[in-house]
Amino acid sequence: WRKTPEGADRTFLQQECYQEIRQKRCRTVGRPCHYSAQCCSDFCAHTISNYYYIKRCS
């Protein structure tokens, strides 16, 4: 997992994925990446204390 400041999330996620994460509407792509995480495209992300924790889905 890579921790990134909330303001930097668009570097890692496409805009519509970012919006879906904020609205908790991401749909899982492929296998789930991690429990309680949302998967968009080939990324998996969840928020803790205003930080995004991001990794590639595999």
Curated annotation (Swiss-Prot):
This is Conotoxin Am6.7. It comes from Conus amadis (Amadis cone). Probable toxin that inhibits ion channels. Disulfide bonds join 26-40, 33-44, 39-57. GO terms for molecular function: ion channel regulator activity; toxin activity. Residues 1-25 form a propeptide. One of its GO terms (cellular component) is extracellular region. The cysteine framework is VI/VII (C-C-CC-C-C). It is found in: Secreted. Mostly non-hydroxylated. It comes from the Eukaryota. Keywords: Cleavage on pair of basic residues, Disulfide bond, Ion channel impairing toxin, Knottin, Secreted, Toxin. Expressed by the venom duct. The lineage of its organism: Eukaryota, Metazoa, Spiralia, Lophotrochozoa, Mollusca.
